[in-house]
Each structure stands twice: as C-alpha cells, then as structure tokens.
C-alpha cells in the first residue's frame, strides 16, 4: 500500500496536539531553548520560512529526544508600515489586516509538523504585549537608559517617519526606497552608546556566533583611538576654536584644509546671514544622510573664506571649507584634510585645487620623492607598515603608522593642544516614529509638569481604532480626541506623545517574553531564570547589525531593570545564520529588449507554450516581481510536508543557499516512498550483523552531524542506512530493529513518516517520545581497514582487507589487483612495502 502523506501527516499532527507533546514545561530536566527569528505576518509563508523553521525543528526534536525540556515557541513581529500601506491601498484597518494574515500564516505553518508550543504564541501588537513593552519602557526611563533630545534625524519623506541609521540603506529608506533627508526633531533615544565598549568587548565571548556576524557588529560599533585637538580661528570672536577629532594625527603636517559638516554650529551661524551658504547646506541635505551614502556621493565643498591657524605653526593658515562628506554625529563635525594619505581628501583637494603635501612615503624616500608619489593618488599603507616620515613631527623618521599615531598623541598632550581619546561610531538609538501602527510611547506632555511618564496603572496606552489613512503622515496627530489626556503627576490637562516606537523595539526583547508570555509583568523571573538564555538562535545574516545588536542592548537593559538575570546579558548563546532559498528565473525579452519574466509552470523544456525559448538565470533569490517564487502550500499539498522538509535539509550545507528544483523535490519524494516500502515489506526471518553495525554507525554519524548543524550530512547517512537495509537479507526483529533506529534518526527531519515507520517496525508509543538511540562503541569498530596503494609515490588504488591479515596475503592481493597491474605495465616490483593498517608502497 503506497504512503499517502495527505492522510498520514494530519493524523500524526492531531496525535501530537492531543497529547500536548510540545508544551514546554519547567521541571527537573535540563532545558534547551531553540528559537527561530519570528516572522512578519505578510500573509503568506515562503520557502525561506520552511527552511528556517525546519532547521529549528530538527534541533528542537533532537534535543527533546536527548532528554531536554525544550522551549520552541512561535510569535509574530506584527507592527510596522506594511499594514498601514495595506490600509491606504485596500481600505480597512491595519489591525484587521495583521490578524487576518496571522491566521492565514498560522494555517500554513501548522501543516509543516513543527514541534512548536503554540500555547505561548503572541503577536507584538497584542494588547498584553503592548502593555508590558510600555512597562519596560517606563522602567528603562527610570533607570536612565532613555533620553529625549533634539537631534538631526533621518527623515523618510514618503513614509513620513524617522529612520535609525541602520535603517537607511545606500541613502534610501529601508522600506520605502525614498532618498532620506536630514531633519531636526525632538526624539526619544535609547542610550545604547553608553554600552558601546561593553557590547564590543563581549563579542569575544560569543564563541557560538559566526565570526562574520561578530566582525560586522565590531565594525558597526567602531572603536577608534585618536587625537582631539583645537584649531584657533582667525578673526572669528564668536567661534574662537574649532574642535577636531582624528585617528591619523601623524598626518597633521600634511594638512591643507579644514572641513566642517553642513550641520556644524559655525556653518549654521554662517547660513543665517549668507544665502549662498544656506543654499549649499540645503543642497547637501538632498544627497542622503548616512556614512555610506555620503562616501559614494560626489564630493562637494564651499569655501567660507575663513581660516584657522595650524597648531604646530601659528603662521600657517588653513582654509575653512564646508563639505558634504563630513558627518556631525561622528567625531566633532569637523576634520582636517590630509589629501596625500586619504582617498576622500585627495579627491576633494584635486577637485578644488588645494595643496597635496606628503607626510610620509615608502621606506627610504626623501621629501621630493614622497610628494611625487602622492601627486596623482594618495599613499595609504597599512598602519602596521613601516614608512619614512618626510614631514614628521613626533617619533622616529622610520616607523609604523601605529607608532607614529601614538607619538603624535603624546606630542599633542605634552604641548597642550590636544588629548588622546577613544571614540565609538555607535550612536544612540532613536526610536520615535511618526506612524500609527506601532507601540505608543507611554508619556504625556503637560504645560505645568513638562514631559511626564504615564502611570503604570494606566497601561496599556492603546491605539485608537477610528483613524483614517487617506492622507500621508501620522493619524495620531490628526485624531480629534486620542491625544487629550490627564497628567498623572498634577491631574491637569495633558497631551499624549503621538510618536510610536520603532518596530525594532518589539523584536528586541520578544525572546524573553516567550519564557513567560502570560505574565502580568514583562517577565516572570522564576520562568525566565529557568529558560534563558536562548541556546540556539536561527535567522538570516541580514539581521547581523540591526536586530541582534539591539537585542544585546535590550538584554543588558532588562538586567539593569531586574527583568532578566545577570547571566542573560548576552541573550543568545549560539547563533546560526542560514542561507537563502533560490530558484531559477525564466525570462524572455520584449521588442525593446526589456526583460519579461515567466512562472516556472509556464516553461516546459526551456520553452513557453508558443515555442518561444526562455533565458534561464540560475540560483536567483526568490522574488515576486521575477516570478520565481515557489509556494510552500502547493508543495505540501502536492508532495507532503516531509518531502519539503527533507529537500530543504538534504541539498546543501544549511549556511549556504539552496536552489529549489522540481526534480530535487521529486527525488526527495521518491526516497521517502522507498523508505516507506522498506517498512511495509518486512521479511520474516534472517539476521545480519553487518546491518546492525551499519545502524549503529548511522546513530553515531547522524548524531554528530545534527549537533554540528550539518543536516545535509545527516541526510546522506540516512540514505546510506536505507541502502544497507535494502541490500541486507535480514528479516524479522533484526530488520525491525534497524528500521526503528532509522525512524528515530529521521524523526527530527521527517517526523510524520518516522512515526509510520516506527509503528510498523514495532516501536512502543510514538517515536516523538522515544529516547534518542545511543551507538554501541563495540559496533563502531570496523573489522576491516582500507589501505591506499601508492605506485612510485603516487596513489593509484586502494583495497579493503581484514585488520589482522598477514603481510604476505596483503602483498598477494595487491599484486593481483587489476588497477595495480595496469600501472605496473607488466614490470616486476623492485620493492613492495606494507605498513600495517596504513598504506602499501610499490616501487617499479
């Protein structure tokens, strides 16, 4: 009888649900918390979800079988712009759109057979989650972790909201794609910069994280050691000095200009009285705001006509320019340009005809040679490289850049014109968003008392339901009554804060809430102390900076406010970043050469129905616009969930991209059908010690593969075991034992089929409740050994022989081997050396 997943899979899912199999329980067992990054409720799951949650499910089921009390929850990252966009485009309300999508996606995820404790499910837009996030905000405010200040912010003119630096990609808003502008607003900030040094130094302890992610975070935090010093201005009594921070003070003798940010206080003063300066500043605002956008934009400058004195020579004047590449929120908003040793400064100096003077050259160069070296391009060696300083002022003539920087800092401190300081690139996290569909910020503004935290007794502060999205901007600002409230301090009239929180706040502590999702406080410490930390976190590399850095900060904030134990300062013990699921793109071109994309089902043998050949682009990221998206619902309905899971695990290492192909899915389906037949047709008699040995080797190898996140290797070992069962003459209990072992090894990956095989092979209860098998060490020791054969120093063949075979018998087998005879070409061996258990050398 053929295996029918449409019947089997729902039956086992119902059995697990009725038994409450996956409810996480705090008991005497060791705990294991596995968490995949929770999804945004877009309305449809995609193959990336299937891969991500299948990997997490393998780990959860495996650990459960090993005797751990496993927490494997699911929730929804539910606030955000798409719901408002849907309300604007389709009518309706963001809440209805969001909860409708959650219901749809829950219905799509459950048929995958994931071992999730659904009793812990929540959405970040739930009233209960909003209440506890607001309580957490108030605790953080009281602890001094939140501040409100006027600041230059990234303004998305399409979404009409503020973006954090991390949410600006190539100068554009991460959701809208609009060019971001710089604007000054009063904002709420989390003081993440207070933790810069700790967040950086603690990265070394995250041994379970990919090195790439740790490096990305370290670069983002951006610790640097440099010199902060003062240029004295000429004839500017209101601004007698300009403060500058540099990481290369050793190049000070190569300075040719000072450049100010368009947002520098001196520039603002100049713009107030000079329309040309004001116009240039406005032009700068239109090119983007982030370091990345500014680095790639054409370098623009405005000569103010003002000058400063060089700190090493009072008679040496440097011009003051305004430059679009100088950022106000890093350093001091002012730099000195050393064009000889900086690509950006060289480009600027060349464009505006400013001097280019070498500070150092290649080792052994004189001043004239060094100046010639940098005339056309900057000389930027590694700081660890020794160079010759031709315009040096501190330290030896021949020294490394590192030594020269230290010497320059010491020189400045002794001379009194500067101090050595450490700075970080990481800025405070601005969380104010001018949107409706987000968590309200629980503060009020009172004319008498100022800005006042809402009383906890009044939480949650919920969003009004009667809002309109017919015009851009924040509906909360336009609502006739919602903002009007009472001051919790004096009882007088007050106005609610109409900004809502950045949605990254919601996902920065959800892992902690899963430990006690129904608690009347942000966490329930006995539960949280038991379950935290997350033992294995799984998600995309694209979250390396935003989500993961914010979560590390939030964990520290929750420790400080008493909601997490000290041991949870780093919330994720291990992190795995999976690859994408890709698919071929099928494309033709129209009469103007523009691409026209086609659905996979419209292409047969490389052609459309009308015979038009298509271009095939392999391994492309799935994209609705390019019509190469595969719907998991169709795969589950057509092949079953186990086939989708098996394919996702089998095709490539999980950290790499996997290409979904129909042929691959069909092959996975055929293998599972073959496994079913092995269990459906069990001979009555016969034992086979080799099969028992193969089963125990499979236990050992699959266990190590799953523990090492090498799921594709685990799949390969199960293929080998299935082949061993098929070839074996064993029947009866010998075969059933091998099948039960195979069912247990497959259970984390294809749990429904594993239950069927377990049942057919005489397993007790359900395989999901069975203890993970242990390999018998005696059966892992092979009675034979493979010996490579080298002929004249080159490996040409190998033979498998019993471990205790005498040398003379091995020699006879070697000389009789067809491959060996071919390479010997009829010659007698001069030497034949057998190294027992290792190698055979033949010299002819």
Swiss-Prot record:
SUPFAM superfamilies: Anticodon-binding domain of a subclass of class I aminoacyl-tRNA synthetases (SSF47323), Nucleotidylyl transferase (SSF52374), ValRS/IleRS/LeuRS editing domain (SSF50677)
Gene Ontology BP, a term: leucyl-tRNA aminoacylation
EC assignment: 6.1.1.4
UniProt motif ('KMSKS' region) ranges: 621-625
Pfam family, one: Anticodon_1
Motif ('HIGH' region): 39-49
Gene Ontology molecular function terms on file: aminoacyl-tRNA deacylase activity; ATP binding; leucine-tRNA ligase activity
Keywords: Aminoacyl-tRNA synthetase, ATP-binding, Cytoplasm, Ligase, Nucleotide-binding, Protein biosynthesis
Major localization listed first in the record, in broad terms: cytoplasm
Residues annotated as signal peptide: none
Location of the protein in the cell: Cytoplasm
Binding-site residues for ATP, renumbered to this chain: 624
Entry GO CC: cytosol
Enzyme's top EC category: ligase
Ligase found in the keyword field: yes
Protein family (similarity comment): Belongs to the class-I aminoacyl-tRNA synthetase family.
Protein name: Leucine--tRNA ligase
């Amino acid at each position: 009888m053929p295996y029918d997943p449409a019947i089997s899979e729902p039956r086992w899912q119902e059995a697990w649900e009725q038994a409450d199999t996956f409810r996480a329980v705090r008991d005497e067992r060791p705990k294991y918390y596995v968490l995949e990054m929770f999804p945004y409720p877009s309305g449809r799951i995609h193959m990336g979800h299937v891969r991500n949650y299948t990997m997490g499910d393998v780990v959860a089921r495996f650990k459960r079988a090993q005797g751990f009390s496993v927490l494997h929850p699911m929730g929804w990252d539910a606030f955000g712009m798409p719901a408002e966009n849907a309300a604007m485009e389709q009518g309706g309300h963001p809440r209805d759109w969001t909860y409708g999508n959650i219901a749809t996606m829950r219905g799509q995820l459950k048929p995958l057979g994931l071992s999730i404790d659904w009793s812990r499910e929540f959405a970040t837009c739930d009233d209960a989650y909003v209440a506890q996030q607001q309580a957490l905000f108030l605790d953080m405010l009281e602890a001094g972790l939140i501040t409100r200040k006027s600041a230059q912010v990234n303004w998305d003119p399409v979404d009409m909201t503020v973006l954090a630096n991390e949410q600006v990609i190539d100068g554009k808003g991460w959701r809208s794609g609009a060019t971001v502008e710089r604007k000054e607003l009063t904002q709420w900030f989390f003081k993440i910069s207070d933790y810069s040094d700790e967040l950086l130094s603690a990265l070394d302890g995250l041994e379970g994280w990919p090195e790439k992610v740790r490096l990305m975070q370290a670069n983002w935090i951006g610790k640097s050691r440099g010199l902060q010093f003062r240029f004295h201005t000429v004839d500017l009594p209101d601004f007698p000095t300009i403060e500058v921070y540099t990481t290369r003070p050793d190049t000070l003798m190569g300075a040719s200009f000072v450049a100010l940010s368009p947002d520098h206080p001196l520039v603002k003063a100049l713009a107030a009285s000079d329309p040309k300066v004001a116009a240039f500043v406005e032009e700068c605002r239109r090119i983007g705001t982030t370091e990345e956008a500014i680095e790639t934009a054409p370098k623009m400058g405005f000569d103010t006509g003002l000058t400063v004195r060089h700190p090493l020579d009072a008679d040496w004047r440097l011009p003051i320019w305004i430059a679009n590449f100088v950022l106000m929120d890093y350093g001091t908003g002012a730099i000195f340009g050393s064009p000889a040793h900086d690509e950006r400064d060289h480009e600027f100096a060349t464009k505006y005809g400013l001097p280019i003077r070498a500070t150092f050259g290649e080792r052994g160069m004189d001043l004239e040679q060094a100046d010639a070296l940098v005339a056309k391009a900057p000389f930027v060696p590694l700081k660890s490289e020794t160079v010759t300083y031709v315009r040096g002022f501190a330290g030896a003539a021949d020294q490394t850049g590192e030594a020269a920087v230290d010497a320059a800092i010491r020189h400045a401190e002794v001379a009194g014109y500067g101090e050595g300081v450490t700075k970080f690139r990481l800025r405070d996290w601005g969380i104010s968003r001018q949107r409706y569909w987000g968590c309200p910020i629980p503060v009020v503004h009172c004319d008498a008392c100022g800005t006042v935290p809402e009383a906890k007794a009044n939480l949650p502060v919920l969003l009004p339901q009667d809002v309109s999205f017919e015009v851009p901007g924040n509906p909360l600002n336009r609502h006739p009554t919602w903002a009007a409230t009472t001051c919790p301090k004096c009882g007088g009239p007050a106005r609610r804060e109409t900004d809502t929180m950045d949605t990254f706040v919601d996902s920065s502590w959800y892992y902690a809430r899963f430990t006690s999702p129904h608690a009347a406080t942000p966490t329930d410490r006995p539960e949280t102390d038991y379950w935290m930390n997350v033992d294995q976190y799984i998600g995309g590399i694209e979250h390396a900076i935003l989500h993961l850095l914010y979560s590390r900060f939030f964990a520290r904030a929750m420790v400080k406010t008493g909601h997490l134990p000290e041991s949870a300062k780093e919330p994720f013990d291990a992190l795995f970043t999976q690859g994408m699921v890709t698919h071929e793109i099928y494309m033709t071109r129209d009469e103007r050469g523009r691409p026209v994309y086609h659905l996979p089902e419209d292409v047969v043998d490389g052609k459309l129905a009308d015979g038009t050949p298509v271009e095939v682009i392999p391994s492309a990221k799935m994209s609705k616009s390019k019509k190469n998206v595969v719907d998991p619902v169709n795969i589950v309905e057509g092949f079953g969930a186990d086939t989708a899971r098996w394919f996702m695990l089998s095709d490539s290492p999980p950290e790499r991209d996997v290409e979904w192909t129909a042929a691959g899915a069909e092959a996975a389906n055929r293998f599972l059908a073959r496994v079913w037949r092995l269990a459906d047709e069990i001979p009555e008699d016969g034992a086979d010690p080799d099969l028992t040995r193969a089963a125990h080797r499979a236990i050992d190898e699959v266990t190590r593969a799953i523990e090492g996140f090498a799921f594709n290797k685990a799949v390969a070992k199960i293929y080998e075991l299935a082949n061993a069962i098929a070839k074996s003459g064993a029947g009866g209990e010998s075969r059933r034992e091998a099948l039960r072992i195979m069912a247990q090894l497959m259970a984390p990956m294809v749990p429904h089929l594993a239950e069927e095989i377990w049942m057919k092979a005489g397993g007790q209860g359900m395989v999901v409740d069975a203890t993970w098998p242990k390999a018998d060490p005696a059966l892992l020791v092979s009675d034979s050994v493979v010996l490579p054969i080298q002929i004249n120093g080159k490996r040409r063949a190998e033979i498998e022989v019993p471990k205790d075979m005498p040398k003379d018998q091995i020699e006879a087998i070697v000389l009789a081997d067809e491959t060996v005879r071919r390479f010997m070409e009829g010659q007698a061996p001069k030497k034949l050396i057998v190294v027992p258990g290792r190698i055979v050398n033949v010299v002819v």
